[in-house]
Amino acid sequence: PIGGITTQGVAFGANVNTRAILDMTAQFDFYHGGGLDVCYLSFAEVDQHGNVNVHKFNGKIMGTGGFIDISATSRKIVFCGTLTAGGLKTEVGEGSLRITQEGRVTKFVESLPEITFSGKVALERGLDVRYITERAVFTLKEDGLHLIEVAPGVDIERDVCSKMAFRPIIDENLKTMDPCLFTDAVMGFK
């Protein structure tokens, strides 16, 4: 479905007030035809070259679903996930992020056993690729992953770099995320 609201509970999967409903083949034709300007996808693992693995980890094959079709034709790709996994607990409030329990699993690894998305191919195609986590934002450049933004309350060395298997390039224009993202209040969008 395009637009509308997804229902919850026992009616999960149904939508209300949709603008359009397409069958799967039409949706994939849209992807293959370059209909996406930007896509938002998750990641299981990311390496120092910006490669992403979503289909095989922890000894299990999960499959790629439509991941390859979507990422192969989008002009901008935004990967979203947590920096670590397996027990990660965070708190937000007063305009900052606090990590109360670190995850046991490193998701930003030196190299990947399986590559679902190629950072090299993305760079060759001139794509804008971002990796957004709860505490840091990275962008892919020719020389690797650049740390471009951190959450308020996060220590770069303790909470970001030490939780990665490689050291990202710290951008010279490193920014702090807007504190309003870390408050339990209306953000005031207009």
Segments from the language model and where they lie:
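Short, low-order "capping/linker" segments at domain edges
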Residues: 188-190
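Glycine-rich phosphate/diphosphate-binding loop of Rossmann-like nucleotide-binding domains
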Residues: 1-3
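Conserved phosphate- and dinucleotide-binding cores of soluble alpha/beta proteins
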Residues: 5-186
